[in-house]
Amino acid sequence: MKYPIILCEDDLLQLHQLERVIDKFILFHDEIFEVVLSAQKPSEVEAYLKQFHPKQGIYFLDVDLKAEMDGMELAQIIRKHDVQAKIIFVTTHDEVLPITFKRKLEALGFVQKDQDYDEYKKEIVELLLLAQERIDAAKVSKTQAFVFSIGSQTFTFDINDIYFLE
């Protein structure tokens, strides 16, 4: 099972920058992650949630979406649809950090948009790997798992998701 990645950023240039970083990362992790939606409007994300019901998704959200709702409100909707979601805010507004605790959003992390590109990229990659690690740990603790390694990568699958091994 690939982990779905959903992006929501109203600024097209910022969205493309985020997509580039994640796409480069996925080149080496394509069996684990997949960008399933890249949106500029929160309503697109909400429609996707209602139609496809993703589970254990990784969500990159701009806090200050210039739309009918902001990133915090969108995160609350995501949390209702995908309880185990890993929510990462990409923002220039570090003053919103306490609000995420107040709203009980359980954000996995915050990435500053206005930092050096290499640092920006490094944070995103670290958060993707952390999201994978936490989702895998939750799976293993809940179910029987089939675990194997190829090179330096370890793969974990729910035993119920396996139909056949060759």
Regions found by a protein language model. Give the residues of each.
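CheY-like receiver
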Residues: 33, 55-136
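Amphipathic alpha1 helix at the N-terminus of the CheY-like receiver
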Residues: 13-27
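Short mixed-charge
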Residues: 28-35
